[in-house]
């Protein structure tokens, strides 16, 4: 009998999974030149800065503030070795050190650092470190703190500094490069930016959008205004995804995008190293990013932050306009192209246009509102928490029937899996297994039997901060050709109906369906009015449905560019007026059209449409009509809490963080 001693057991090596966050963007600290407005320069950053200064951002608002003077900085030590700079890149800084803004917190932290050094020098065990131990160390270090709040703040600082679980960030992060004054050119660059942003009345734009936000609920708030879709020199329109995200006041996203500001965040980090409360959530989002984004043609970190701040400014102006009913874009306002050029390095495949747009908008402020627990594909007993911007639903990879459609509701919200090939969190109902590739050995998020799947709610793997977003992949040929906005290619859209719930209940909190972006495959207005002309399955564009206080409202910017759409829209306007006067019974609609008073109303509405203007009430839909369109054509679903109840459950610091 042969011996088995020579038999070698081959060890199976799996590829590294993408669940562990590794932040490194492979960029230089600062570029070869300083950026300033210059339309003749081939630099993308300079070109965008030039667009910001071409005309005033806003014509009224707060008065200009004096630029903050920079601190005098000691000369760098020329004897510093290369090893010191490498060591600095690997250093981590506790986020609490940056978000604390008051002097008493700064002094308190200095005392806490002294206590930490004392404990580390003596190799003390802090597992059972109490207030009594803290007071004893303070007495030895001659630190006098008697108030209860101060003592517990000190204890928190000490334990946070010595704990490996505290939230920290590497100094190689672009914001930390600015915070630590890593290069003399950074200060020179920020001085040039002050000359760029001040003439454009930048502070007025910030103050106005923040004031507008306090009084805004959804687009019905602006129902007394005339909505404009075209101007003489306008060349585009506000993208429907922007209307879906900012046409309704969404919790957490509003705090980061409207209350927060990327440019002032950079200034505060560099000048005073203290961040104001308005920028708390933006700062936390940015410093806890899993991976950076890269802008095409930009090769250094500081320039990337400047470009990000410029895009944030353009988005802010777009938000201001769309909430005033201004839906057209001029050349200096076109932000879509800049968003389409962002490279998301954590994605292993080219995104479809709508996913690219959604991911880019959210990545500008690092918005990831959902924290989901995902099982490690190679270690089933290892469950990790992963923050995500949105959850992906892929109908083409699921087997469905008329009696068993894809259902997004409170019972299926916890059915999630991680796709290692794309680095995305996938919606995976228990009765519709997600068919991944061989390299993506997906397993159930919480492996339980289908008969007891209701137990998922008890140990919820989904924690949501105000807003939850779904992205539905309906393109049937997404991996063949992409980039409709550049190539003119039209994808085939899968219009298989889905069961979409009006509300989700997550951890006892109700999240309502606030908005939906849908694929436009035909002239939907004429189709809804009874005509079957123009129906097909090819993508022509997008439209948005908002659920406002006055009912579902449709934003369809492409409807003004077709005669058939304009005629159908006029009919829709007249029907809404008829329903307003006579209820939902349309039996006498055509007799009503022949009345003299109706003809005058029709002429007024026709004149408005000829000038590409409408009233808010002209585009209202019935709830049944809206849900039918969403069921067949939705590509983005936005669920959120009502904003005021969201604030009521938060403390003053949690509102910003």
Swiss-Prot record:
| Principal cellular location given in the protein's record | virion
Instruction: Report the GO terms under cellular component.
Output: virion component
What is the name attached to this protein's record?
A: Major core protein 4b
For this protein, what post-translational modification is recorded in UniProt? The precursor is cleaved to a mature protein during virion maturation. Proteolytic cleavage of major core proteins P4a (A10L), P4b (A3L), and VP8 (L4R), which occurs at a late stage of core formation, is required for production of infectious mature virions (MV).
Localization per Swiss-Prot or TrEMBL: Virion
Q: Which InterPro entries match?
A: P4B
Keywords on this record? Answer: Virion
The record's comment on protein family reads: Belongs to the poxviridae protein P4b family.
Entry superkingdom: Viruses
Which ranges are cleaved off as propeptide?
1-61
């Amino acid at each position: 009998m042969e011996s088995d001693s020579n038999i070698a057991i081959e060890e199976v090596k799996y590829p590294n999974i993408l669940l562990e966050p590794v932040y490194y963007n492979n960029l230089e600290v600062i570029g070869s030149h300083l950026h300033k407005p210059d339309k003749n320069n081939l630099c993308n950053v300079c070109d965008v800065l030039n667009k910001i200064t071409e005309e005033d951002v806003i014509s009224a608002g707060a008065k200009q503030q004096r630029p903050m003077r920079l601190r005098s900085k000691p000369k760098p030590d020329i004897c510093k070795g290369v090893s010191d700079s490498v060591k600095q890149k690997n250093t981590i800084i506790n986020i609490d050190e940056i978000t604390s803004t008051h002097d008493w917190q700064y002094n308190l932290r200095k005392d806490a650092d002294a206590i930490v050094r004392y404990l580390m020098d003596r190799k003390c065990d802090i597992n059972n470190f109490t207030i009594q131990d803290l007071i004893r160390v303070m007495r030895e270090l001659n630190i006098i703190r008697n108030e209860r709040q101060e003592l517990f703040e000190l204890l928190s600082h000490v334990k946070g500094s010595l704990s490996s679980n505290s939230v920290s960030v590497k100094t190689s992060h672009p914001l930390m490069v600015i915070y630590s004054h890593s290069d003399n050119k950074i200060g020179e660059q920020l001085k040039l930016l002050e000359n760029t942003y001040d003439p454009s009345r930048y502070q007025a734009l910030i103050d106005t959008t923040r004031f507008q936000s306090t009084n805004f609920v959804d687009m019905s708030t602006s129902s007394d205004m005339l909505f404009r879709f075209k101007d003489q020199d306008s060349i585009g329109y506000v993208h429907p995804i922007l209307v879906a995200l900012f046409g309704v006041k969404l919790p957490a996203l509003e705090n980061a995008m409207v209350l927060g500001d990327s440019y002032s965040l950079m200034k505060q980090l560099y000048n005073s190293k203290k961040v104001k409360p308005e920028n708390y959530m933006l700062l936390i989002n940015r410093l806890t990013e899993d991976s950076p984004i890269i802008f095409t043609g930009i090769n250094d970190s500081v320039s990337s932050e400047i470009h990000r701040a410029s895009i944030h400014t353009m988005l802010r102006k777009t938000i201001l306009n769309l909430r005033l009913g201004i839906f057209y874009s001029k050349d200096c306002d076109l932000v879509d192209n800049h968003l389409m050029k962002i490279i998301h390095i954590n994605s292993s495949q080219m995104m479809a246009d709508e996913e690219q747009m959604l991911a880019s908008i959210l990545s500008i402020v690092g918005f990831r509102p959902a924290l989901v627990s995902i099982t490690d594909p190679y270690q089933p007993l290892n469950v990790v928490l992963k923050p995500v911007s949105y959850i992906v639903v892929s109908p083409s990879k699921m087997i469905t029937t008329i009696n068993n459609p894809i259902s997004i509701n409170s019972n299926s919200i916890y059915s999630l899996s991680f796709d290692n090939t794309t680095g995305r969190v996938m919606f995976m109902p228990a009765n519709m297994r997600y068919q991944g590739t061989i390299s993506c050995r997906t397993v159930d998020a919480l492996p339980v039997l289908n008969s007891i799947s209701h137990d998922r709610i008890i140990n919820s793997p989904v924690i949501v901060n105000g807003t939850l977003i779904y992205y539905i992949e309906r393109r049937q040929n997404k991996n063949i050709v992409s980039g409709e906005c550049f190539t003119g290619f039209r994808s085939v859209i899968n219009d298989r109906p889905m069961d979409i719930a009006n509300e989700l209940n997550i951890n006892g909190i109700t999240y309502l369906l606030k908005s939906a972006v849908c694929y436009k495959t035909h002239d939907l207005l004429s189709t809804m009015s009874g005509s079957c002309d123009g129906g097909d399955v090819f993508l022509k564009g997008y439209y948005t449905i908002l659920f406002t206080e006055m009912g579902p409202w449709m934003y369809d910017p492409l409807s003004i560019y077709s005669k058939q759409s304009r005629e159908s829209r006029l009919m829709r306007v007249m029907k809404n007026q008829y329903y307003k006067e006579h209820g939902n019974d349309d039996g006498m609609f055509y007799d009503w059209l022949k009345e003299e008073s109706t003809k005058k109303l029709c002429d007024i509405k026709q004149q408005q449409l000829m000038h590409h203007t409408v009233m808010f009430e002209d585009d209202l839909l019935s709830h049944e009509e809206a849900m039918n369109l969403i069921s067949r054509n939705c590509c983005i679903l936005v669920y959120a809490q009502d904003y005021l109840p969201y604030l009521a459950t938060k403390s003053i610091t949690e509102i910003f963080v």
